[in-house]
Amino acid sequence: MTDKAISLQAAQQVEAAIERVGTRKMILVTHIVTHPAFVVPTPHRIFDFFNAYIGTKDFNYIYDSYNIQYSIMGHVHFRKTLTEKSVHYLCPCLGYQRQWRTDNISQEINHALMDFTI
């Protein structure tokens, strides 16, 4: 099975699970990046190549079709938030210690934590 086929299959499996939830407000949690604003900014000496493997657009129709309030994703090891079309996209990654801005684990964890209401 190709990477593209696996990605599409994952989106279809998520959609099937969402169908069982019904019309309730939802939080979609994925490891992969599901919004292009969350890939690593280029040019980047390493990620110019790897961005192709970090995320997918196969979830786009899910955000357009279902009551997704929050989308929490990871994989890129940086922290970012974005609100678009009433969906709050969150990337609260802790990352590797070498990627932290400080040497204080408590400070880094507290910076990565996010509160939200659904």
Predicted regions, residues:
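Binuclear metal-dependent phosphoesterase catalytic core
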Residues: 40-52, 56-69, 76-118
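Hydrophobic "anchor" residues on beta-strands that sit immediately upstream
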Residues: 27, 70-71
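Generic detector of contiguous secondary-structure segments
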Residues: 13, 75-76
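Active-site-proximal loop/helix segment associated with metal-binding centers of metalloenzymes
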Residues: 1-49
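Short His-Asn-centered micro-motif
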Residues: 30, 73-74
